[in-house]
């Protein structure tokens, strides 16, 4: 993973959502993504559509990581989109 040193990294200008994963399913994924999109719009750092971030992309990440129970964290700043997971 490569992180660009932007205002999100240096000063916290960004938004994130931590989404519970239970039995391989993301809990309230649509609500989390709507809230994240509103935050990005408020911060004037784009939208999920402009970044190409979709429900499918998040679901695919969780499947690729073989995450069945835990959390998926999506962090977005002006220059970065970071997916993380924990069991």
Where are the model-predicted features located?
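Conserved alpha/beta cores of soluble small-molecule-handling proteins
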Residues: 1-87
């Amino acid at each position: 993973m490569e992180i660009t040193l932007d205002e999100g990294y240096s000063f916290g200008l960004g938004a994130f959502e931590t989404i519970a994963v239970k039995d391989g399913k993301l809990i309230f994924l649509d609500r989390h993504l709507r809230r994240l999109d509103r935050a990005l719009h408020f911060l004037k750092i784009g939208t999920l559509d402009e970044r190409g971030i979709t429900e499918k992309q998040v679901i695919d990440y969780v499947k690729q990581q073989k995450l069945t129970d835990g959390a998926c964290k999506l962090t977005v700043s002006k220059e970065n989109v970071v997916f993380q997971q924990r069991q």
